[in-house]
Curated annotation (Swiss-Prot):
Organism field: Ruegeria pomeroyi (strain ATCC 700808 / DSM 15171 / DSS-3) (Silicibacter pomeroyi)
The protein's annotated pathway: Purine metabolism; IMP biosynthesis via de novo pathway; 5-amino-1-(5-phospho-D-ribosyl)imidazole from N(2)-formyl-N(1)-(5-phospho-D-ribosyl)glycinamide: step 1/2
SUPFAM superfamilies, alphabetized: PurM C-terminal domain-like, PurM N-terminal domain-like
Function: Part of the phosphoribosylformylglycinamidine synthase complex involved in the purines biosynthetic pathway. Catalyzes the ATP-dependent conversion of formylglycinamide ribonucleotide (FGAR) and glutamine to yield formylglycinamidine ribonucleotide (FGAM) and glutamate. The FGAM synthase complex is composed of three subunits. PurQ produces an ammonia molecule by converting glutamine to glutamate. PurL transfers the ammonia molecule to FGAR to form FGAM in an ATP-dependent manner.
Name of one Pfam family that matches: FGAR-AT_linker
Gene assigned in the entry: purL
Binding-site residues, Mg(2+) 1: E91, N526
Binding site for Mg(2+) 2: D115, D266
GO molecular function, one term: ATP binding
GO biological process, one term: 'de novo' IMP biosynthetic process
Protein name, as recorded: Phosphoribosylformylglycinamidine synthase subunit PurL
Annotated GO CC locations: cytoplasm
Amino acid sequence: MQEPAITPDLIAAHGLKPEEYDMILEIIGREPTFTELGIFSAMWNEHCSYKSSKKWLRTLPTSGPQVICGPGENAGVVDIGDGQAVVFKMESHNHPSYIEPYQGAATGVGGILRDVFTMGARPIASMNALSFGEPSHPKTRQLVNGVVEGIGGYGNCFGVPCVGGEVRFHPAYNGNCLVNAFAAGLADSDKIFYSAASGVGMPVVYLGAKTGRDGVGGATMASAEFDDTIEEKRPTVQVGDPFTEKRLMEATLELMQTGAVISIQDMGAAGLTCSAVEMGDKGGLGVRLDLENVPQREENMTAYEMMLSESQERMLMVLKPELEAEARAVFEKWDLDFAIVGETIAEDRFLIMHHGEVKADLVLSKLSSTAPEYDRPWVPTPAAEPLAEVPQIDPIDGLRALLASPNYGGKQWVYEQYDTMVMADSARTPGLGAGIVRVHGTDKALAFTSDVTPRYVRANPEEGGKQAVAEAYRNLTAVGARPLATTDNLNFGNPEKPEIMGQFVGAIKGIGAACAALDMPIVSGNVSLYNETDGTAILPTPTIGAVGLLASTDEIIGKEVREGHVALVVGETTGHLGQSALLAEVFNREDGDAPHVDLEAERRNGDFIRANRALIKACTDLGDGGLALAAFELAEGAGVGLHLDDAPTEILFGEDQARYLVACNFDQAEALMSAAGQTGVTVTSVGRFTGDTVRIGGSEALLADLAATFRASFAAAVA
């Protein structure tokens, strides 16, 4: 096939700036081949190179006594004791999910699961954090239905429980939805597999499904803004097969028991190109590939297509040659391809051959560790104007408005489409707070949560970044878990705009401060930039996924609200309504500053909850919607009415941080308040759980009526 001439239009179509193309010419001293141009495009885009964010990502805390492996590998690895580790990561599949919702979301799940089992861990839990445009937007229903079906279709067939997540709606996502997928797995802490190649002349082996033309250019597409040519990008979306992925996982984990694996990497963004380059670069080696040996499911595939295909369910491995026969037998047993497609070489070289013809011959390190890196100009986000007066409202009317919104109504419509109990180790399913999964064969359990409040981040990126981590800390604490570590999924607009880069920098500063103060290092993550359509950016959305440990399932704080239980707020309430849910849903306002996050108070109050778990029957953190919404959710979940003391609107619906709502019997309440007095923690009685109505001061409604609104609002908006 005649390869196209390299023209300015072709260079631009590959997402390369003119100055970046000049760098390529300087590096290789000649015009690149078409395949080489594609390789540079894939490796130098934002999705693979982090060229706009690397400088700031380096400032995050990534180490701690519990951290076995931090950022840089397929997933983070954290010690949980007894020779075991939890392996986890969160990653975006935003652009593909907007173009083709079902396959975009499904392959997002598949990709994050591969990141986990590539490290030698069997997946035990998944979550997803989803952001969509306003429900009335003509594309929103299609996106919600397609994304949720895609996540369920892939995860359910693969057989991993979905234990939590988030769903939000906002006009800022009308042109770009966000699909952030999280997965966690268990491994022996001394049997973690890494991606750095070692040894010269070692076989490079292709594993899994065959290569097709799906996903060619996907990583480059995921590093660009959308415009009115979006439909043309549909072929760049990958197609997933969860049954093949299941077989690939079983074969990979079985292969790892043979001792044949030197290094292993899944094929995700930029496919064969990125996996081969990363393995070689991390090991200080070069790689030669012979593409005629690549298993192909389509005829007449070019070198360019094979190198950039993002066909799913594929891995690349460097193998001990003496164990080739044993390794091949494992993959043949699982009816998967096993093909030697190249070898490691001593030179810093990426050599691509196809039927004896050189298709690419590049300096390998220039594609990865020494790729371009930018210090983008940025401007701080201006301080928010003071909050204008917020009128007092009838509290039941305010609560009903929140419950009627798909943002704050029940999410059963979503998680009932997911298998939450497969593997039979889920101790708490989605609905309220963190999900919990038992560590099979032990008394331990792991808790998982995903959190961010984008309105806060837009108003005050640094406080919003802190708040995302602090809320994750509280959600883990509220179920009794000790927070261990975090993964971040940083979703922002165009980093070439100084105001967007300022949001990113501010959020990173806040996340870093909170992770350091709360001993929750970042061990993995993902950056998704250029989430803009026709120049309109999403809300800055730095999603935080976090994992906590319970030494025993006896430590789980339940949701056992009973008739007569006292409702107590742990933490200081001042009545912060800026950027609150009430302000948005009742008054159609998004003004004021984000709530301040006092990290010392977060730690002190979290320690207090865990130390006094024996006195607490139910616990939830106070976030969106404040006391009124949190108290209703506890009451609704238990089927018990709620009487809250009369208080001003800002006290009932304010979103002050570092707070929890707990339920306990009268004697326990007295003991808890006594303990608080000795530790400097504020605990306030705010009402009790009783009857079959929700009464707030002098305003009252039937619990059943409010519950019906709560349970129907999401489906009414999107079904």
